[in-house]
UniProtKB/Swiss-Prot annotation:
Membership in a protein family: Belongs to the peroxiredoxin family. Tpx subfamily.
Disulfide bond annotation, renumbered to this chain: C60-C94
First-level EC class: oxidoreductase
Other remarks on this protein: The active site is a conserved redox-active cysteine residue, the peroxidatic cysteine (C(P)), which makes the nucleophilic attack on the peroxide substrate. The peroxide oxidizes the C(P)-SH to cysteine sulfenic acid (C(P)-SOH), which then reacts with another cysteine residue, the resolving cysteine (C(R)), to form a disulfide bridge. The disulfide is subsequently reduced by an appropriate electron donor to complete the catalytic cycle. In this atypical 2-Cys peroxiredoxin, C(R) is present in the same subunit to form an intramolecular disulfide.
The protein, known as: Thiol peroxidase
Organism: Pasteurella multocida (strain Pm70)
Pfam families: Redoxin (PF08534)
Length: 165
């Protein structure tokens, strides 16, 4: 269990958040095409997991835009933007914004992923959604960088995540 804050109010997050050196085991999410998507779909690539509560909030949307911009410059790296949003909402947002360099994936069918990644908000107004986090994986899903953002209304440290690639 971890603690983060939402507008200064402490909330509990369930699961064990991966640390540098840990290996993240594969998990299943849903793509914009409503197809099961796993880390194995990106085998041989480094992966940035941009995890957030909902693409329809300002800070979450900003993180998707910023990682989309950086993804175009990254060789052999897939950026997965992971939230509980329905794939339709994710696709609508990326289509309207012209974002083509990131992969949006939804946990709406498999919320066990939240606990597996240590980002499952279990109390407060956002219970059932994910905490804001960034996890960078190498080609073998070993963690190169991990940040559980301490305040949900705060952006992640993009520079720190990108520096390990």
């Amino acid at each position: 269990m971890s603690k983060i804050t939402l507008a200064g109010t402490e909330i509990e997050v369930s699961g064990v958040f991966p640390q540098v050196g840990d290996v993240v085991t594969d998990f299943t999410t849903v793509s914009a095409k409503l197809e099961d998507t796993t880390l194995a779909n990106f085998a041989g690539k480094r992966k940035i997991l941009n995890i957030f509560p909902s693409i329809d909030t300002g800070i979450c949307a900003t993180s998707v835009r910023k990682f989309n911009e950086q993804a175009a410059k990254l060789a052999n790296t897939a950026v997965l933007c992971l939230s509980t949003d329905l794939p339709f909402a994710q696709a609508r947002f990326c289509g309207a914004e012209g974002l083509e360099n990131v992969f949006t994936v939804s946990t709406f069918r498999n919320k066990d992923v939240h606990k597996q990644l240590g980002v499952d908000i279990v109390e407060g107004p956002l219970a059932g959604l994910t905490a804001r986090a960034v996890i960078v994986l190498d080609e073998n899903n070993r963690v190169l960088h991990s940040e559980l953002v301490p305040e949900i209304k705060q952006e992640p440290n993009y520079d720190a995540a990108l520096a390990v690639l």
